[in-house]
Amino acid sequence: MAHTLPPLPYALDALAPRISKETLEFHYGKHHQTYVTNLNNLIPGTEFENLSLEEIVKKSSGGVFNNAAQVWNHTFYWNSLSPNGGGEPSGALADAIKAKWGSVDAFKEAFNKSAAGNFGSGWTWLVKKADGTLDIVNTSNAATPLTTADKALLTCDVWEHAYYIDYRNARPKYLENFWALVNWEFAAKNFA
């Protein structure tokens, strides 16, 4: 089965000025598309040819895994953002964040510290553990919670291509602006 680039849940310029249209043109239109294209070139005639994206991520390794996981990770990232995002979580998710970190601000500080310290290229995730508690997890390269017992709630892409056009090498500045775009509704649905 051929995989396709999922549509963005908003217009290319909808996250500006925090994430520019130019960044999305490259990040979504080039990087994300390339992972889809590479995956489609790698799977014909293999055991992965007719599997869903999630099944491929869970069962593959090497180039197939890297491209499939990056398709999944990026799609999750786009949904973790919203032009109407920001603010604070509510309900059960807010309660779980406060139970773990004491406050939403303390959580954001811990997340930013983790993401800023995520060496090289990767992802920083808010995850729900098997016991129902929350945690912040860094993954490198294409690694994803999808291959673990953790349930991803939201993610921040800390590959340089996610922020270099807008913030150059200032990852902490990108992280500061990330919170104004966070889609807490998406995170809450994943938590439920």
Curated annotation (Swiss-Prot):
It is an enzyme of class 1 (oxidoreductase). Its EC number is 1.15.1.1. Pfam families: Sod_Fe_C (PF02777), Sod_Fe_N (PF00081). Binds 1 Fe cation per subunit. Its cofactor is Fe cation. Keywords: Iron, Metal-binding, Oxidoreductase. It comes from the Bacteria. Disulfide bonds: none annotated. Belongs to the iron/manganese superoxide dismutase family. This is Superoxide dismutase [Fe]. The gene is sodB.
